[in-house]
């Protein structure tokens, strides 16, 4: 794990993250024009960072947030499509991999169902290697149709990569799922705004440490007329320490070199903080001392997870018993979100 240079090597993957200024767009033509700006930025960045193997742009960087529902549906993209063609050309010209946001991707039943919030990982030949749909849209505000699966793909120089999006990262389950599928780098693209800056900086560092994985965060910056985005795009080591972090500046860039050997060595030889290994070898010191073998205990001890898998509806009812039974709340109603009738005291 190296930071401060502009290089890379056969072992180290050069990764850049961008504080892209949140655009405010309304038409397909404006979206495509913005795609060209992203493409030009990518090519320019490669001149300044010759070691750059992978560049990551934030959630909403392509389309911006369409606050008008008709505009959101009208500008929703097909994948592959015109937007990805522009990105593919840039990746080929710069010989760089890229992560790009498409908000939204047309649903299979478009326009009868809401679009997906989608990320793509594209290789340096302009081919889409991974397409990830946001599992946890930021309700109650975001109206995206939820995805249902994480992925791991071989990225530049063989580094194993998973993509997640913004609010996904507030749920430890998704990080663990990616890591247990073999991800060495979890890319978190976000369009996160104030007031949640401190929490979001903290959670990505904690999840890197807890899952023995690199984390690359690309966040939006600026003000789009509705929200103020805090930037702080960052690259985090698998020990939870920040290698590089931007401030709040629009179009700020950070860059670091991620060693494949170091993370693989740590996962193989780490002991007290090897969380992935220890989770399925629980208490092995105690079982050795007890004559019960040297593997520890593999069984999942967490009742909630087995209950959720085997009885999702029943588990939802259980959670509603100590939270609420409607998706909305009458004490802070949001248009279009059902809530129970207010109680008069």
From Swiss-Prot:
What family does the entry list? Answer: Belongs to the carbon-nitrogen hydrolase superfamily. Aliphatic amidase family.
A Pfam family this chain is assigned to: CN_hydrolase
Organism whose genome encodes this protein: Delftia acidovorans (strain DSM 14801 / SPH-1)
Q: Which UniProt keywords apply?
A: Hydrolase
Hydrolase recorded as keyword: yes
Top-level lineage group: Bacteria
Q: Does the keyword Disulfide bond apply?
A: no
Protein purpose: Catalyzes the hydrolysis of short-chain aliphatic amides to their corresponding organic acids with release of ammonia.
Q: What is this protein called?
A: Aliphatic amidase
Active site residues per record:
59 (proton acceptor), 134 (proton donor), 166 (nucleophile)
**Recorded catalytic activity of this chain's protein:** a monocarboxylic acid amide + H2O = a monocarboxylate + NH4(+)
User: What does the record give under GO molecular function?
Assistant: amidase activity
Q: Which Gene3D superfamilies match?
A: Carbon-nitrogen hydrolase
| InterPro entries, alphabetized | Aliph_Amidase/BUP (IPR050345), Aliphatic_amidase (IPR023719), C-N_Hydrolase (IPR003010), C-N_Hydrolase_sf (IPR036526)
Show the PROSITE patterns listed in the entry.
CN_HYDROLASE
Q: What EC number is given for this enzyme? A: 3.5.1.4
Annotated CN hydrolase domain residues: 13-260
């Amino acid at each position: 794990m190296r930071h401060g240079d502009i290089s890379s090597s056969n072992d180290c993957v050069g990764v850049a993250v961008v504080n892209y200024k949140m655009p405010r767009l309304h038409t397909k033509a404006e979206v495509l024009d913005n795609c060209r700006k992203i493409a030009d930025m990518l090519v320019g960045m490669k001149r300044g960072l010759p070691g750059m193997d992978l560049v990551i742009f934030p959630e909403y960087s392509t389309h911006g947030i369409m606050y008008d529902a008709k505009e959101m549906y009208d500008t929703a993209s097909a994948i592959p499509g015109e937007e990805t063609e522009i990105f593919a050309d840039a990746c080929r010209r710069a010989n760089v991999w890229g992560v790009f946001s498409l908000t939204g991707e047309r649903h299979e039943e478009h326009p009868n169902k809401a679009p997906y919030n989608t990320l793509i990982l594209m290789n340096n030949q302009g081919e889409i290697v991974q397409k990830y749909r946001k599992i946890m849209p930021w309700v109650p505000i975001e109206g995206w149709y939820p995805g249902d699966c994480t992925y791991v793909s071989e990225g530049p120089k063989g580094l194993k990569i998973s993509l997640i999006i913004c609010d996904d990262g507030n749920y430890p389950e998704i990080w663990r799922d990616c890591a247990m599928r073999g991800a060495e780098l979890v890319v978190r693209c976000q369009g996160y705004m104030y007031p949640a800056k401190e929490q979001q900086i903290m959670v990505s560092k904690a999840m890197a440490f807890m899952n023995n994985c690199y984390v690359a965060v690309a966040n939006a910056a600026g003000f789009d007329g509705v929200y103020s985005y805090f930037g702080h795009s960052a690259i985090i080591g698998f020990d939870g320490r920040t290698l590089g972090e931007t401030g709040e500046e629009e179009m700020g860039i950070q860059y670091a070199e991620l060693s494949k050997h170091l993370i693989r060595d740590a996962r193989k030889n780490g002991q007290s903080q090897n969380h992935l290994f220890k989770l399925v070898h629980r208490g092995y010191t105690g079982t050795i001392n007890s004559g019960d073998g040297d593997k520890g205990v593999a069984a999942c001890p967490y009742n909630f997870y087995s209950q959720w898998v085997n009885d999702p509806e029943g588990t939802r009812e259980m959670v509603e018993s100590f939270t609420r039974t409607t998706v909305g709340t009458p004490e802070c109603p949001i248009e279009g979100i059902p809530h129970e009738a207010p109680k008069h005291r």
